[in-house]
Amino acid sequence: MSSVFEIVNQARRKNKLKRELLDNEKKVRDNRKRVDLLENLLDYIKPEMSHDEIVAIIKNMKADYEDRVDDHIIKSAEISKARRDISRRIRELTEEDKQTSGKK
């Protein structure tokens, strides 16, 4: 019986480490995106530009990123809907299988 507990304990530990790894990878990816954003900003800003021109560039970049966020939110909603539809279909198939198996 103790080996079962050890297996469960190790599986939980493995899952926890997997979640931590995914979280850390997300943080690395997010920070790389920030670095890319700042590099892009440096490419656009020139020494002879006025403050208003710089602000206009930043506002334009902000609007572009907000549009991307909106696109990702919409895509997430579509994926979630597809997952719910699949789950519903699996439940229906399971119920049909139970009813068919019960009649045999």
Curated annotation (Swiss-Prot):
UniProt key word Coiled coil: yes
Annotated localization: Cytoplasm
UniProt entry keywords in alphabetical sequence: Coiled coil, Cytoplasm
Transmembrane segments: none
Superkingdom of the organism of origin: Bacteria
Membership in a protein family: Belongs to the pole-localizer TmaR family.
Protein name: Pole-localizer protein TmaR
Organism classification: Bacteria, Pseudomonadati, Pseudomonadota, Gammaproteobacteria, Vibrionales
